[in-house]
Amino acid sequence: MKKVLTIAGSDCSGGAGIQADLKTMMAHKVYGMSAITSLTAQNTTGVYGISDVTPDFLANELECIFDDIFPDAVKIGMVSNSELIRTIADKLKKYKPKNIVLDPVMVSTSGSRLLEEEASASLINILMPLADIITPNIPEAEVLSSMKISKSEDMVEAAKVISDKLDGRTAVLVKGGHDLNTANDLLYCDERAVWFEGERINNDNTHGTGCTLSSAIACNLAMGNDMASAVENAKKYISGALKDGLNLGKGSGPLNHAFWLDINR
């Protein structure tokens, strides 16, 4: 059985963070493990509290995993301060896992900054160069490329700029999402731009979509798929999870990560 590690925050409501990651991993029939960076008190209506773990505790978590059940892929999500980012980078350099997927949780889809400047700089300069693929949304891609993205051509140019900053070693998946009124995503890998068309699904319950997509990519890479195939398969999975129409909570609810298990019985 393939093994996948998620390094991210905990969502007590189960829709995002490591809970969404582990559900995605189970649906893909891989063995999921988690190293928690922070505890969050949140639900479908908002985030009401965040408590980070200490760098020493995160280091202990990562060592316990890497020294015992070595992962075939690693997904990195919410990391809210520079010390934790440096801790993760140190362990990745020490253990050298393959198939690192980084969801750079820097800016919300509404444009709100989620990281302080120091933490953003650490994420960009220390952690991103270690990743095999990063999955920014449009606002995050704008920050990383220092350009405004208002049309599809801008997504391609921004992805090239980001890739060049990372010396072309890291694939860049720019997620179209709500910002361009399209569900199409752009993968820039090995100096090639590949579009993945997505179906616009009429469902306001999108809590945890970014976490789920990056985890599904990690699962597919762990199973031996190439980068383009991993992204394509992950897109299909998240579309199905949205289409299932799960409706929980008073706000933007979660996806049905388990729909895949029903299909693949």
Spans of features found by a protein language model:
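Conserved N-terminal subdomain of the carbohydrate kinase-like
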Residues: K2-T6, I18, M26-T109, R113, ...
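Short pre-catalytic strand/loop immediately N-terminal to key active-site residues, enriched for Gly-Thr
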Residues: I7-S13, V194-H207
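Short, small-residue alpha-helix embedded
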Residues: Q19, E142-V143, N203-M227
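Phosphate-handling active-site elements
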Residues: K29-M33, V194, N220-A234
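Charged C-terminal helix
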Residues: D52, A228-R265
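Nucleotide and nucleotide-moiety/phosphate-recognizing core
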Residues: R86-Y95, R192, M223, A228-S229
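Conserved phosphate/ATP/ADP-binding segment of small-molecule kinases
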Residues: E117-A193
